[in-house]
From Swiss-Prot:
GO terms for molecular function: acylphosphatase activity. Residues 2-94 form the Acylphosphatase-like domain. Its EC number is 3.6.1.7. The active site is at residues 17, 35. The gene is acyP. This is Acylphosphatase. It holds the Pfam family Acylphosphatase. It catalyses: an acyl phosphate + H2O = a carboxylate + phosphate + H(+).
Amino acid sequence: MIRLVTMRGRVQGVGFRAFVEFQATGLDLEGWVRNRRDGSVEALFSGPADAVEAMIALCRQGPSAAHVAALADEEAHPDQLRLRRAGERFSGLPTV
């Protein structure tokens, strides 16, 4: 299962990307996370359906300093995994 997830609210400047990277690594997911200039955080998760769904649930909560006002997720194409850094299962990417 591959899902593209976008979180909106107080999600930048609160450790959200580090939280996502830590949790996704713990769930053995592949993918990436990045800030967007519009103030949202975007992440791609690839792995077993139960692990991806667990990660999406964690994103709804976020780290303690965050407030997720909205979360959208959609099916993603495997080509989007290519955005991560070579040799990494899960990457934090630059802002777009």
